[in-house]
Amino acid sequence: MRLAGVNLPLNKHAVIALTYVYGIGNTSAKNILAKAGVAPDKKISELSDEEAHAIREIIGNEYTVEGEARAEQQLSIKRLMDIGCYRGLRHRRSLPVRGQRTRTNARTRKGKRKTVAGKKKAGKK
C-alpha cells in the first residue's frame, strides 16, 4: 500500500507501518487507526479498500506529513534564525540548541574536529 508517497510494508501491523511516514509517530498512528475504525494489530495486507481510503482521508485532512512536514520544520528554524533569537543563533552556528555542554562532546552537531594551530596543553611544573 502506498501512502503519502511512501510504500508501507505489507507484512507489518498497521500501527507500525504508519510510522514509516515522516510526521506520523506511534501515538498519531494509533489515533488515525482509532478514527478510521481499524484494529491496530491488523496487517497492511489485510486492509480492505474502504479502510485504506479512510486512513488516507484522515491523514490528508488532519496531518502534515512527508515533504510538507519537512518544509514546515525548515521554515520554523529559518524563522528563529531570522528573528535573531538565541535558538536561531545556535542553529546558525551549528551548535547544540537545547542547552547541552559544548566544551567536550557535541560532536554530532559540530561535525568533525578542526585542529587549532598553536594550541598546546600546559605541561606539569
UniProtKB/Swiss-Prot annotation:
GO terms for cellular component: cytosol; small ribosomal subunit. Keywords: Ribonucleoprotein, Ribosomal protein, RNA-binding, rRNA-binding, tRNA-binding. Residues 93-125 are annotated as: Disordered. One of its GO terms (molecular function) is rRNA binding. GO terms for biological process: translation. Pfam families: Ribosomal_S13. HAMAP family: Ribosomal_uS13. Located at the top of the head of the 30S subunit, it contacts several helices of the 16S rRNA. In the 70S ribosome it contacts the 23S rRNA (bridge B1a) and protein L5 of the 50S subunit (bridge B1b), connecting the 2 subunits; these bridges are implicated in subunit movement. Contacts the tRNAs in the A and P-sites. Belongs to the universal ribosomal protein uS13 family. This is Small ribosomal subunit protein uS13.
